[in-house]
Amino acid sequence: MISELVRSLSEQYKYKIEMHCHSMPASACGEFTPEEVVRTSAEHGYSGIVLTNHFMRKCICDGESDAEYVDRYLEDYYRARLEGERIGLEVILGLELRVRANSNDYLIYGTISREDAIRMIGAAN
């Protein structure tokens, strides 16, 4: 019964996309490199992922400027995107933002410019 339902849903929905995943070193909780995240996702039948690493001030290393942090953050995405292009898996940039106003995490999907990211880190917790 369950396997029939899974098969039916798989036929109806052409896309299987992971909407929230982390990689290392951009996210401290990430267990895999960007390339490993992409390859593992493809091996499990995903057609795409949204790389939503943690985007918060506490991730900034001592002495690192906001711009340097953003560049380091984006590096994981660029690495994942290159691997995705190589093996045919769509990689979308996202982020998991925690703002100062509360301790909620917000998932943001889609592209963001480097300049916007630098401005956003100022609002991050």
Language model region names:
Residues 2-125:
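A metal-dependent hydrolase metal-coordination microenvironment
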